[in-house]
Amino acid sequence: MHTVQKDTTFTKIFVGGLPYHTTDASLRKYFEVFGDIDEAVVITDRQTAKSRGYGFVTMSDRAAAERACKDPNPIIDGRKANVNLAYLGAKPRNLQSAFTIGVQQLHPAFIQRPFGLTPQYIYPPTIVQPSMVIPTPIPSLQSPYIDYNAATQAYTHYTTAAYEQYPYAASPATGYMGYGYTSPVQQPLSTTTGAPPTAYIQYQPQQLQPDRMQ
């Protein structure tokens, strides 16, 4: 007959931050005050037989495991340990400090733009020939997480199909600036350094006033 394995999801505890001299006996001694223990094991180095800094304790019931994990700063063998249910992993030491460090290390160029929208193209109301397209060295920024300066050198030239534009520009006589939007098709980043991509600005012809044509 096969022995039914006991579910230890809510009873098995991960214990981190243990000193080198911690043993199975000392680990069990700390946790036995919270309830009955099925197993207490310190993971040791094969060569030195010393603690590798972590171990596992399996309590007999869920309530005992919850009591053992309640203390946010447990001291085991004279050292502050990290105790949490094994399936959840180690507890973060300090959520506030971890958040502060993460914000300080975040470069402003990597901050995501609202809604992840790509930059828009402006169509100024200048009197030029219809459908005239003038290339200008304006970098195209597709990914909100890519460094703006490095992107101009990392991107390869995009095909004209990737720049499908929708002329939603208003009439120049209204005095409003029209906007076009790029296609959501994105090309993969190139590992080699290339020339900055060329964006295109399209100028709409301006309608002449009837009194000026006389």
Curated annotation (Swiss-Prot):
UniProt note on tissues of expression: Strongly expressed in the nervous system. Expressed at early neurula stages of development.
GO molecular function, one term: mRNA 3'-UTR binding
Domain RRM: 11-88
Record-given protein name: RNA-binding protein 38
Locations listed in the record: Cytoplasm, Cytosol; Nucleus
Database matches in Pfam families: RRM_1 (PF00076)
GO CC annotation: cytosol; nucleus
Keyword Cytoplasm belongs to the record: yes
Record organism: Xenopus laevis (African clawed frog)
Domain of life where this protein originates: Eukaryota
Keywords: Cytoplasm, Developmental protein, Differentiation, mRNA processing, mRNA splicing, Nucleus, RNA-binding
Family statement drawn from the similarity comment of this UniProt entry: Belongs to the RBM38 family.
Task performed by this protein: RNA-binding protein that specifically bind the 3'-UTR of VegT transcripts, leading to maintain their stability and stimulate their translation, thereby playing a role in germ layer formation. VegT is a localized maternal determinant essentially required for endoderm formation. Also has some proneural function in the open neural plate and in the context of retinogenesis. May also act as a mRNA splicing factor. May play a role in myogenic differentiation.
SMART domains for the chain: RRM
Residues forming coiled coils: none
InterPro entries: Nucleotide-bd_a/b_plait_sf, RBD_domain_sf, RNA-binding_reg, RRM_dom
Protein's GO biological process: cell differentiation; mRNA processing; regulation of RNA splicing; RNA splicing
PANTHER family in UniProt: GEO13361P1-RELATED (PTHR48024), RNA-BINDING PROTEIN 38 (PTHR48024:SF28)
Keyword Cytoplasm: yes
